[in-house]
Amino acid sequence: MSKELSYDLVVVGGGPAGSSAAFAAAKKGIKVALIEKENCIAETVRTSGVTWIQNIKEFGIPDDCYNPIKNFSFCSPNNEVTISDSEARAAVLDVRKTYRWLATQAENEGVDIFVKTNINNVIKNNNGDIIGVKGT
C-alpha cells in the first residue's frame, strides 16, 4: 500500500545536521519531515567528543547530555599534552543523548519524524529539480 504525504521540506538523515536543519526550518514555519533509516534516532552512533561547556550552554544542550571534566590529555604517538583546571571548562558529550535531544527539539517545533524509513528514489520535475522522495 502506498501513502502520499506532503511537506515543504524533507530532510533525509536524523543525525545532528539533519535534526538541526529540520528544527531550524520548522521554527520558520516550514512543514518538515525528518526521515531516518534506523529504528530510532542515534541508534548507530559510533562517536564521542570533548567540547567546551560554554559552547554547550550556548546551544542550550541540557546538563544531562554531558559530563564536565577538569583534566584531560591530548595524546599522539610522539607527544602528550595535559590540561588541568580547578573549574570544569570542557565536557564529554553523551552524543547519543544529545542527538536524540536535537531530534526532540525538532519534533517539538512540529517536525514529523519517520524512523525505519529508507529513501530509495527521488522524484524530479522536468527541470531536474528534486520535488519529492519515495521510501519504504
PLM region descriptions:
Residues E4-L9:
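Extreme N-terminal starter segment of soluble prokaryotic enzymes
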Residues E38-D63:
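Conserved N-terminal glycine-rich FAD pyrophosphate-binding loop of Rossmann-like flavoproteins
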